[in-house]
Swiss-Prot record:
The modification Phosphoserine is found at S522, S765. It comes from Mus musculus (Mouse). The lineage of its organism: Eukaryota, Metazoa, Chordata, Craniata, Vertebrata. Its main location: nucleus. It is found in: Nucleus; Chromosome. This is DNA repair endonuclease XPF.
Length: 917
């Protein structure tokens, strides 16, 4: 067994020189660390986790994912740490969580659990050593973490707060974004570590890997398609600006349209007025998304996959034709022509043929048989083959380096990895032919023509992969060819070993059918077992790490893995000497730099494959430039930032920790009699556990109102013993109205509380309209949201609707509604369920007969209680006279309706109906 491939996993490499400087700075003073992408914020966090893995400490970690927590725990276990971090999830009973906290060490817990435990006192706040915040740039968007830090600082003035992030671009939006983040984190220091930092740059330059940049030239057809897509993209952007003059012109540039964050940028501008936009603008936004996908497919996948996407768009031409016409531009025609030319070509019809003859013989079926398949190979495939050939040649003379070096090929996603595996296993011809057959099954006759030509001399065949010798694909795989097939477990689908194929062209029918069964264009294809008749072994998963034969070659995706550290594990366990970057990804490039620097003396060569002059190259360069500009902006902000001494909240002078009206930015309303409603009783609100995903509980708490988190079946907020609130966002409101769930909720609230309230909360940055534009000029329908809302208020007369533009307005409204009112009881609120029968509000009435009586003509919510107070049961009600009913109901018309309903015979009703007809 070879070194580095044993069952024992390797521990994380020791800190580098500049990383030690980061740790010393952060140990000296709390702060926010902003690193460049890939420079190892996880390594920094891991070091602090290791420092505090001791029962004498109690450190909380926020904003980590389960996969990351598992990775950190495993790494600490490898290093022999005894007191490992623990996870606090909903599987641990609430009454036993206090014991978990008092055992000390590192605690990974969800934000909702921590908020509830802070509010209920289950967590010993005064014993907390500190809090580590991961992905600190999200502290404003995710309100729960900010709430936790505020609760922590209110009860603990000594503990530390250290925050980490590697997303500098996130601070580039909004006004004083980084300052607001630091305010929510209660930190005064900002530590910036860009890639161009002197300490980082000088150290990594001393240990930089050998980089071989290979600028691959796109084929003429690919260049023509790229130009056409860019022309269409530019036309759509101009039209979008024309229809929406208020949009920022700089952000809607063609360069920004190529980057990944463009969809988020355009939604940021259009969301506030999305309901006011016409169909044209909405269609253009969708078109931009499709065009960006086309650009990605062009450079990422093969010619057949790209053509299949285009043809599917053409198949939905009617849908697009109603909204936008980019499919009918000249550039679109050029794109389709060149995309088809990469896959097949139709021979020119001789001009001297008579028109009648051509009409008789040019049926669609006959024309299809005249297609000659071209199946243009991806230029990067050939570059990859050349690289593997070079690596193999070097491995033959690698005795001085300790044997052949392992190879790691990194592509963007699972689909690309599967295509590379199949290409290296079967060759370009077989792979593309199989994919063509799978995608365009109806063109069977055309395939036969191409296959027949292929078996002959084949002068018309123009597949690019034929330009190199047939033995070339197999030469690179001479060592892997003898390996056994791998059957990977489901959780290891992201790891794929490159397998060899037979030397001869797969002309045998059985072999071709075998190849056709291999999935190539779907992500699931990575999990398909590659079978060969000569190899029928089921080896363990260790075979994926090359224990059987050398040199080991692994293909791994850069993105899309369920485990974010899958690639890191492969890198450190396989220890490749050669890394082939099939796709450019900034984070992994930096990760390779750190990997090389942490292994001094061990060679590492990185092959960088990129299309020269392509949108792929432009995207990579734009990402670099945006990160550099973001750091430059942060450096300027740091130089001019004014940070108050009390920012860390270690004394009582920090206003952010104050509760009540003194802490609010809004001016005090003197009409409220100076707040005389505070008569010594602390205000409180009973809140449902599920509501802690929103920002509202945090804002209520900041207003000086205590929160009692419990599990409620009826309502979301209990403000007073009589006032129950059901909170709905606009989308939730519409869904609940359509499903009937809101009716059941209002029924339960009306039954058990005197003042049921429906709170409709909408985001001020996302205005909405319950009815489409021009709806009032049309006939109203019962399916409309407005109609259903009207029916709801008619059915529940005591139900009140509250419209709030933001959680801040809701918190202020709740405070006003609670003035001079008694406080709710959490135990009573928890006891109220949809099936409750004996309750303070309804202990005198049976809910079943009450609902039945309300359905009778003449009985409504106003006279129902009077009727139930004076009549014992339904049998007695049926014996009452009209005069007695008039006295009870207080209205002669209602009394007559009820009396007629109870005493009119069914036959009389039928006869009256016939008379009316």
């Amino acid at each position: 067994m070879e070194p580095g491939l044993s069952g024992e996993r390797r521990s994380m490499a020791p800190l580098l020189e500049y990383e030690r400087q980061q740790v010393l700075e952060l140990l000296d003073s709390d702060g926010l660390v902003v690193c460049a992408r890939g420079l190892g914020t996880d390594r920094l966090l891991y070091h602090f986790l290791r420092l505090h893995c001791h029962p004498a400490c109690l450190v909380l970690v926020l904003n980590t994912q389960p996969a990351e927590e598992e990775y950190f725990i495993n790494q600490l276990k490898i290093e022999g740490v005894e007191h490992l971090p623990r996870r606090v999830t909903n599987e641990i009973a609430s009454n036993s969580r206090y014991e978990v906290y008092t055992q000390g060490g590192i605690i990974f817990a969800t934000s909702r659990i921590l908020v509830v435990d802070f509010l209920t006192g289950r967590i010993p706040s005064d014993l907390i050593t500190g809090i580590l915040v991961y992905r600190a740039h999200r502290i404003i968007e995710s309100c729960q973490e900010a709430f936790i830090l505020r609760l922590f600082r209110q009860k603990n003035k000594r503990g530390f707060i250290k925050a980490f992030t590697d997303n500098a671009v996130a601070f580039d939006t909004g006004f004083c974004h980084v300052e607001r983040v630091m305010r929510n984190l209660f930190v005064r220091k900002l530590y910036l570590w860009p890639r161009f930092h002197v300490a980082v740059n000088s150290f990594l330059e001393q240990h930089k890997p050998e980089v071989v940049e290979i600028h691959v030239s796109m084929t003429p057809a690919m260049l023509a398609i790229q130009t056409a897509i860019l022309d269409i993209l530019n036309a759509c952007l101009k039209e979008l600006k024309c229809h929406n003059p208020s949009l920022e012109v700089e952000d809607l540039s063609l360069e920004n349209a190529l980057g990944k964050p463009f969809d988020k940028t355009i939604r940021h501008y259009l969301d506030p007025l999305w309901h006011q936009l016409g169909a044209k603008t909405k269609s253009l936004v969708q078109d931009l998304k499709i065009l960006r996908t086309l650009l990605q497919y062009l450079s990422q996948y093969d010619c057949v996959t790209f053509l299949n996407l285009l043809e599917s768009l053409r198949a939905t031409e009617k849908v697009f034709g109603q909204n936008s016409g980019w499919l009918f531009l000249d550039a679109s025609t050029s794109m389709f022509v060149n995309a088809r030319a990469r896959v097949y070509r139709v021979p020119d019809v001789k001009l001297n043929k008579k028109a009648k003859t051509s009409e008789k013989t040019s049926s669609p079926e006959v024309q299809e048989t005249k297609k000659e398949l071209v199946l243009e190979s991806n230029p990067k495939w050939e570059a990859l083959t050349d690289v593997l050939k070079e690596i193999e040649a070097e491995n033959k003379e690698s005795e001085a380096l300790g044997g052949p070096g392992r190879v790691l090929i990194c592509a963007s996603d699972d689909r690309t990895c599967c295509q590379l595996r199949d290409y290296l296993s079967a060759g370009a011809e077989t792979f593309l032919l199989r994919l063509y057959r799978k995608t365009f099954e109806k063109d069977g006759k055309a395939e036969e023509v191409w296959v027949n030509v292929r078996k002959g001399d084949g002068p018309k065949r123009t597949t690019k992969s034929d330009k190199r010798p047939k033995a070339a694909p197999n030469k690179e795989r001479a060592s892997a060819k003898r390996g056994a097939p791998l059957k990977r477990k489901k959780q290891e689908l992201t790891l794929t070993q490159v397998l060899g194929s037979a030397e001869e062209p797969p002309e045998d029918k059985a072999l071709e059918e075998d190849l056709c069964r291999q999935t190539s264009s779907s992500p699931e294809g990575c999990g398909v077992e590659i079978k060969r008749e000569s190899f029928d072994l089921n080896v363990s998963s260790d075979a994926a790490y090359g224990i059987l034969k050398e040199p080991l070659t692994i293909i791994h995706p850069l993105l899309g893995c369920s485990d974010p550290y899958a690639l890191t594990r492969v890198l450190h366990e396989v220890e490749p000497r050669y890394v082939v970057l099939y796709d450019a990804e900034l984070t992994f490039v930096r990760q390779l730099e750190i990997y090389r620097a942490s292994r001094p003396g061990k060679p590492l060569r990185v092959y960088f494959l990129i299309y020269g002059g392509s949108t792929e190259e432009q995207r990579y360069l734009t990402a670099l430039r945006k990160e550099k500009e973001a750091f430059e902006k942060l450096i300027r902000e740091k130089a001019s930032m004014v940070v108050p001494e009390e920012r860390e909240g270690r004394d009582e002078t920090n206003l952010d920790l104050a509760r009540g009206s003194a802490a609010l930015d809004a001016p005090t309303d003197t009409r409220k009699a100076g707040g005389q409603e505070q008569n010594g009783t602390q205000s409180s609100i009973v809140v449902d556990m599920r509501e802690f995903r929103s920002e509202l509980p945090s804002l209520i708490h900041r207003r000086g109102i205590d929160i009692e988190p419990v599990t409620l079946e009826v309502g979301d907020y209990i403000l007073t013993p009589e006032l129950c609130v059901e909170r709905k966002s606009v989308s939730d409101l519409i869904g609940s109205l359509h499903s009937g769930r809101l009716y059941s909720q209002c029924l339960a609230m009306s039954r058990y509380y005197r003042r049921p309230v429906l709170l409709i909360e909408f985001d001020p940055s996302k205005p909405f309209s319950l009815a489409p534009r021009g709806a009032f000029f049309q006939e109203m329908s019962s399916s409309d949201v407005s109609s259903k809302l009207t029916l709801l208020t008619l059915h529940f007369p005591r139900l009140r609707l509250l419209w709030c533009p933001s959680p801040h307005a809701t918190a202020e409204l709740f405070e006003e509604l609670k003035q001079n009112k008694p406080q709710p009881d959490a135990a009573t609120a928890m006891a109220i369920t949809a099936d409750s029968e004996t309750l303070p509000e309804s202990d005198r009435y049976n809910p079943g007969p009450q609902d039945f009586v309300l359905k009778m003509p003449g009985v409504n919510a106003k006279n129902c209680r009077s009727l139930m107070n004076q009549v014992k049961n339904i049998a007695e009600l049926a014996t009452l006279s009209l005069e007695r009913l008039t006295t009870i109901l207080g209205h002669s018309g209602n009394a007559k309706q009820l009396h007629d309903f109870l005493h009119t015979a069914y036959a009389d009703l039928v006869s009256k109906g016939r008379v009316r007809k």
